Amino acid sequence: MNISSNPMAHAIAILFIVFSFLFIPATTLFESEQEGYISAVISNKGLDFAKDLLIEKAVSSMIPLQLSDIEKSVKIPVIGKVQLGLSDIIICSVDIASSSVETGESGIVLVASGATANLSMDWGYSYKTWVITISDKGTAIVQVQGMVVVLNVALINQEGTLKLLLLDCGCHVEDIYIKVDGGASWLYQGIIDAFQGKIVSAVEDAIVKKIREGIIKLDSLLQSLPKQMQVNGVVALNVTFMDDPVLSNSSVELEINGLFTGADGVSVSNYCYYYHKGSQTFLSSKGSAKMVEISLHENVFDSAASVYFKANYMHWIVDKIPDQSLMNTAGWRFIIPRLYEQYPDDDMNLSMAVTSPPIIRITDHDIGTTIYADLVIEVLSSGEVVPVACISLVISASCSAEIHGNNLAGSIRLVNFTSSLKWSNIGNLHMHLVQAVMSTILRTFFVPYLNLHLGKGFPLPLPHGFTLQNAEIILQDSRVTVCSDVRFTDRYDLNNQLPVSW
């Protein structure tokens, strides 16, 4: 494959960026400040995808690769001492026959084998006779075969960010073939004798040097990753890495904090989150294996609800609903007669406020939520807003999760609710009649309004340029797990930034 040029460091980043957003739970009871609530696992299929992408990008980043000039004096039979030189030595293309990636206690080991590299170069020579100096020049084509490149790295957690350590890096060339254009009959063997080993060493050293430079650059970029991902003007996601990555012989596993905080940096640390983290296996193994599984514990959603609640985003003034007659006291004349008697034909508002953060619980087949809210009936009388009664609601709803692009979205369905009179300035209310009106309001305003926003969802922590493909959602063990393949769209600038969404 002949691949155009791109910066080496960012190309090598592709593999480890994929690794950097894969998370798995541990096995003990912890608080949120110590453990992560977004976890994921990357499978062998995902590792192979990342490996192939890494190799493609690494090759494209280093081609064309110019090597240093080589000079040497050699003795040629009959002719004597000859000064030989090679210049403009360029690796033009690299083809990888096979590759593998292994993970385990020794780190991540990537092996590219059976590689072939094609080089072009200029040659020149000169030697002196007793009368004159004789010189010549031309071009040559070189092919190195049986090249093996081995890269061994480790990922560790350093104060909430990932640090990349290069454990070993090597390149070995098995064979070399040289084709010389032009020159005297003795030139070919002279170049072979003088430069075969030097060309091999130059290729091996240049590739290793490029990889080392890329690893150093990548480590610096990983260290610079922010620990917070802005979702919108209200909430941000804590993406601090928790614990060291776990590398088994079939997967790479990491975890992040995963709780939402206020966009201004205010956390919800006064809410204590506890859960038991059991060992995690691939949920998609029953069917076709997916590349990655991203798991979000129910506490992630609880933290988001807490932030929105604290930011006063769970208070609505309702003045328009499909049954607009309920926005006038005349529509209530048979439901609350005294309301109409005191405020005949006055327009109304309904002020609805959630009184505590919604409680979200995930079971094996459902996402359930309980919402406590107060609904205040307000009358617009003589230019004033007059609260006349308050009804307390306990709402039970069922949520479904779905994937829209790279966003985890959803919808909500009203299961049931109870209502009770909290206070009233218009006497006692017939709550069985009011209950029917509350049902209409909840089904025609509250639920559609929530679904409008839930349908947009929030972004999963994926690298820029990667999209989910054929995603499935599984509900299990208090978690929403997204099992998905990924696709690389290459729609970002590798030259300017590390390709991550935060």
Segments (PLM) and residue ranges:
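Mobile, glycine-rich extracellular loop/lid and propeptide segments
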Residues: 134-135
